[in-house]
Amino acid sequence: MLENYQNLVWLGLSISKSVISLLEKRKLPWIMAKEEIRGPLPGYFKVSEMTISQEPKAKTRTLFGKDVPGAEIKELSAKRAINEVLSQFDTVIKCTRNVCKECGNLYCHNMQLTLHKRNHTQKKCNQCLDCGKYFTRQSTLIQHQRIHTGERPYKCNECIKTFNQRAHLT
């Protein structure tokens, strides 16, 4: 994604430094509400504002309001770059539909979000109060707590040793 923004800057489109900074940190520069999914991105560039030279090659281009001599822009490659960036936006837009309301993480597939949500709910239910570890099942937590309490409910009839898990009996 950052590379696509760099391509837009190379083409002469102005992108704010804060947006590039967010992309370098691998964060999205915006989060859209469901109603705005197909709308334009407010506060950012608009492709319609970009002008491409009608000549096959332009000898200069403008970057942040300054002319850069010797730069060549082909109309075809500029259109290709824009289409590539727009396809990336479609991917980002699809991913913004599945946002975790608790922590703000983005997921492209609804199933990924569903699995992620379990992390938030299970932390409250299955956390060991002694060491802070989290468990997906309460039965696993109960087994784990025997380590802290020293409880050994399973006894071997042959050697008289005791164990904290039935699976350790052989």
From Swiss-Prot:
Domain of life, source organism: Eukaryota
GO CC list: nucleus
Limits of the KRAB domain: 1-42
Record's subcellular location: Nucleus
GO molecular function: DNA binding; DNA-binding transcription factor activity; zinc ion binding
Keywords: DNA-binding, Metal-binding, Nucleus, Repeat, Transcription, Transcription regulation, Zinc, Zinc-finger
Zn finger spans (C2H2-type): 98-120, 126-148, 154-170
Record PROSITE patterns: KRAB, ZINC_FINGER_C2H2_1, ZINC_FINGER_C2H2_2
Major localisation: nucleus
Function recorded in the entry: May be involved in transcriptional regulation.
Similarity remark: Belongs to the krueppel C2H2-type zinc-finger protein family.
Name recorded for this polypeptide: Putative zinc finger protein 542
